[in-house]
């Protein structure tokens, strides 16, 4: 049960500190929709998505009205489509992508994920065909999101697929060049991808998640920043404790929404993702929290330390506030979506290399990084390989969402609008990793995988 005091505190956090719920995501299994006939699969899928998510928008609006708590996005996550379309032609796959996008528009769902594949080991011809369809699938849709998992701590890293994905990302950028290569913002490459992630572009409904469930993603960097502003001369352990307490309060709001949405939609409750997700608004930034902790400018020395502290405190505080936690759970550092990170890029203190170091202690990885459009595909592949190695060898989720903005060079401006914000094109290291990437093959799992 939630006390009246908790509800009053939540209302105050909304009014004063930009607290919101980033997403209510309905996860739906499509295994019982599968068919060798693409149109039959599409028809079955449509019926099932409408059955479970048809009332999602109305319920989210009802929650906003009842609790005064903004629900920024309504989303749907599907069983990875690659598991259901082995026999489909390239053209069939694009038809499926278009159908999913149309369903999302009809239900007024902001984003729909699950055009996904897991390729930890063998890169077979069916999966290669599916991944090759991703550029056209994203170029011909508006709300569809796609992801590929290329490595796990238990299985190792698939360099063959990483090599291919450099060219795939370049192709997405070219095919969506009229929108500053926006298609790349709807595609992410993972290591150790979670099955219950409510956040896009990496959300999909895992095979062990049941027929349907609801997962909630919280937000609230502004709440943490406001609390830290009152702790100007506090010791670092007091700072840690303050973050932990604020994370507890933010997560309680997420748990409240999860329980209410589950009851109204008559769908089992899944998890609350304990992630602090920034927005382009000033005052709603992870970078500003790091600077409030004591870093002069994000990207300067001490940034990784401050981020590690923040990430751990958020997890510890949030874990006490929710019945079930999961997803990515930590602090997000998407450059274009965080006004403070954008300032760091513009001032030169925040580099790609520093961001990579930060990903070793935070929730995701190199996220919403805009790089020059003429970057070689092998450089993108090597960027992915570096980040995947951090995830696989440290037994954590990492990801890469990089935008090689077509026709743009270092220092140019790119603006995606909305939650995705905008950023200057970042400087990259131009040394060639081509010889490394062209070796191909698989990297065996690390010794820490032998845990039984």
Curated annotation (Swiss-Prot):
Signal peptide: none annotated. Pfam families: DUF711. It comes from the Bacteria. Transmembrane segments: none annotated. InterPro entries: UPF0210 (IPR007841). Belongs to the UPF0210 family. Homodimer. This is UPF0210 protein Athe_2116. It comes from Caldicellulosiruptor bescii (strain ATCC BAA-1888 / DSM 6725 / KCTC 15123 / Z-1320). The lineage of its organism: Bacteria, Bacillati, Bacillota, Bacillota incertae sedis, Caldicellulosiruptorales.
């Amino acid at each position: 049960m939630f006390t009246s005091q908790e509800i009053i505190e939540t209302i105050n956090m909304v009014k004063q500190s930009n607290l919101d719920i980033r997403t209510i995501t309905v996860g739906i299994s499509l295994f019982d929709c599968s068919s060798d006939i693409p149109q039959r699969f599409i028809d079955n899928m449509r019926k099932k998505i409408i059955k479970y998510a048809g009332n999602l928008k109305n319920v989210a609006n009802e929650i906003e009205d009842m609790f005064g708590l903004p629900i920024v996005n309504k989303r749907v996550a599907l069983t990875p489509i690659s598991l259901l379309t082995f026999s489909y032609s390239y053209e069939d796959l694009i038809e499926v992508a278009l159908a999913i996008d149309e369903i999302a528009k009809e239900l007024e769902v902001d984003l729909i994920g699950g055009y996904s594949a897991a390729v930890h080991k063998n890169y077979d011809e069916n999966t290669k065909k599916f991944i090759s369809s991703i550029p056209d699938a994203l170029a011909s849709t508006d709300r569809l999101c796609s992801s590929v998992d290329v490595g796990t701590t238990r299985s190792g890293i698939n360099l063959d697929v990483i090599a291919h994905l450099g060219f795939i990302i370049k192709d997405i950028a070219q095919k969506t060049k009229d929108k500053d290569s926006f298609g790349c913002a709807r595609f992410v490459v993972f290591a150790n991808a979670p099955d219950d992630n409510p956040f896009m572009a990496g959300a999909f409904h895992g095979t062990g998640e049941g027929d349907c469930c609801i997962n909630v993603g919280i937000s609230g960097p502004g709440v943490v920043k406001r609390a830290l502003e009152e702790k100007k001369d506090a010791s670092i352990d007091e700072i840690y404790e303050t973050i932990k307490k604020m994370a507890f309060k933010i997560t309680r709001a997420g748990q409240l929404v999860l329980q209410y949405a589950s009851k109204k939609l008559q769908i089992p409750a899944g998890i609350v993702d304990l992630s602090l997700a920034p927005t382009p608004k000033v005052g709603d930034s992870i970078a500003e929290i790091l600077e409030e902790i004591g870093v002069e400018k994000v990207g300067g020395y001490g940034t990784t330390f401050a981020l590690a502290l923040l990430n751990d405190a958020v997890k510890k505080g949030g874990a006490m506030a929710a019945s079930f936690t999961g997803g990515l759970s930590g602090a997000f550092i998407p450059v274009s979506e965080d006004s403070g990170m954008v300032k760091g890029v513009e001032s030169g203190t925040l580099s790609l290399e520093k961001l990579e170091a930060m990903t070793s202690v935070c929730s995701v990885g190199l996220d919403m990084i805009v790089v020059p459009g003429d970057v070689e595909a092998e450089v993108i592949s090597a960027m992915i390989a570096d980040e995947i190695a951090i995830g696989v060898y440290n037994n954590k989720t990492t990801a890469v969402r990089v935008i090689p903005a077509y026709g743009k060079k270092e220092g140019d401006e790119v603006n995606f609008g909305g939650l995705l914000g905008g950023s200057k094109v970042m400087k990259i290291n131009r040394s060639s990793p081509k010889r490394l990437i062209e070796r191909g093959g698989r990297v065996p799992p690390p010794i820490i995988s032998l845990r039984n």
